[in-house]
Amino acid sequence: MPLIIVVAGIALLLLLTIKIKLNTFVSLIIVSIAVAIASGMDLSKVVTSVESGLGGTLGHIGLIFGFGVMLGRLLADAGGAQRIALTMLNYFGKNKLDWAVVCSAFIVGIALFFEVGLILLVPILFAIAREAKISPMFMCVPMLSGLLVAHGFLPPHPGPTVIAREYGADVGLVLIYGIIVGIPTFILCGPVLNKFCQRIIPDAFKKEGNIASLGATRRFSESEMPGFGISFLTAMLPVILMAVVTIIQMTHAKSAADSGLFYNVILFLGNSTIAMLISLLFAIYTMGLGRGKTIPDLMDSCGKAIAGIAGLLLIIGGGGAFKQVLIDSGVGQYISTLVSGMDINPILMAWGVAAFLRICLGSATVAAISTAGLVIPLLAVHPNTNLALITLATGAGSCICSHVNDASFWMIKDFFGLTTKETLLSWTLMSTLLSISGLIFILLASLVL
């Protein structure tokens, strides 16, 4: 019965969002309440469960997400992201544009959320394509693979950040393992897959794209952009801070001496929220004050960045409410009991649930957060599971098979002037391979970590 309730809840969510076209956040709250009631939860506890799920999720991610999106906006508005992309392209040269693009997208993607990175990088690709006299499609798949790996695997992106907290995983470890697993994944799904796509959809690689669909975009001159070194450091500072502290924790056993002021300061600086705040303040100087911009101008950019994610924050909160209802209603525990005797690898379980929800719901973030509600009870049966790898497996599963119920599918189709079939055989194929290959690399990592 609980399984039927979950499936019915997902079906209701699809009906509300796709057929009736109700707002996704409102739909998630309605479905959360419906699933709670159908599961037999005491009516007096339904609203409390929804509120605690929403508040608990946003309470953690709100600061990280807010600081992160402001940092990304400052980097983009100063031309830092464009500098990173162009430097990588110049370094690799015309013959290895796909390698340059995938590396640039991954670096930029750490600081910028998927849709923002896409809108920022596409005009740069079109300009390079014109100069190189090639179709921008030659760089499409590599760019998307770099952005998607960062989006699905790495904090401070919303999915990995929220599920790391829900599972109790160390965010720094998720970052380190995510980079280790992510690099071979985006290489396979970027430059390597790109060659295959050229053979199966050759006509797509003759198209000039649809740059007009992006509207007005700004392209910085050479003198307007900051240097590569400072741009790279600004984008990567959150990663550096969290990774360094995590490595210190891993290599130094905590003793009585470690509990002193120095050790506590290190832990404080490595906290994901503090690391993002420090990085934001650093960006305000390197991408703003140090380049002659005023505080009002910088705060205007930050304000616009926050305004742009208000809807997304609510959707993430709605996903958190759904997750909490699955836990509080006992549905997650029921599924855990059901599969506990099957000896299923929890990494495979997390990936499979996230993949199923992603295909049904379209949103990678909502799929990842909802997965936690079903997987958390299972972790009690497998207490020695590497929680960072469970987080990555959930993220990898949430990346699979982006198709017609995902807004990104239509954005990519429109930007590059593709047919639906061509989009399925490029973007959808890439996201599916990325999810599966990511899972394989995570399973390999679990053998040694």
From Swiss-Prot:
One GO term of the biological process aspect: gluconate transmembrane transport
Membrane-traversing stretches: 2-22, 24-44, 52-72, 106-126, 134-154, 173-193, 228-248, 265-285, 302-322, 337-357, 361-381, 429-449
Any coiled-coil regions, as ranges: none
Domain of life of the native organism: Bacteria
GO CC terms in record: plasma membrane
GO MF terms, alphabetically ordered: gluconate transmembrane transporter activity
UniProt keywords, alphabetically: Cell inner membrane, Cell membrane, Membrane, Transmembrane, Transmembrane helix, Transport
Family per similarity comment: Belongs to the GntP permease family.
Protein name: Uncharacterized permease YjhF
